Amino acid sequence: MLIGLDPGLGAGGAIGLVDGVAVAALSWAPTRALRYEAQATAAALMFSQFPEARLVYEQPHKRRGRSIATYGGLMRSIGIWLAAYPRRSVAVAPAKWRSELGMDTRADDLKLESLAECASWILSDPDSDPNDLMKRAISQENDHVVEAALVARWFRVTRGRGRR
């Protein structure tokens, strides 16, 4: 079981994959004041459903004009998980998995266009058959859920099919 997590600055998503099939998906787009609490709640819900899962998440990075502290919500969201299961959590630099999937690595400019191109890669993988929840998330262009799925998929394909 893999959980992919895309925290985002103002919104985010998480998706649980079992053998490539989406079994749960969460997305959140809270107000600025509630952003971190919503992320923590969403992450806690996902982890409580799948305590044996391996977590793959985008590593916080500093963007021009923004402090790394801006990404404090990510660490609050998954800090307890990381402390409890440090060997079952993997931080991935956004540019690494995006470039390996052929996506544009710029965070904002062509992000949605790149995600739209890569969403078909998730669905066309002959080794998986994502359920309707996943397909709906992609068709509605919920980029946070799609990114969460992509980072989990990247890990599964490049690191040994999501071994526990």
Where are these regions (language model features)?
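Phosphate- and other anionic-substrate recognition elements at nucleic-acid/protein interfaces
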Residues: 1-164
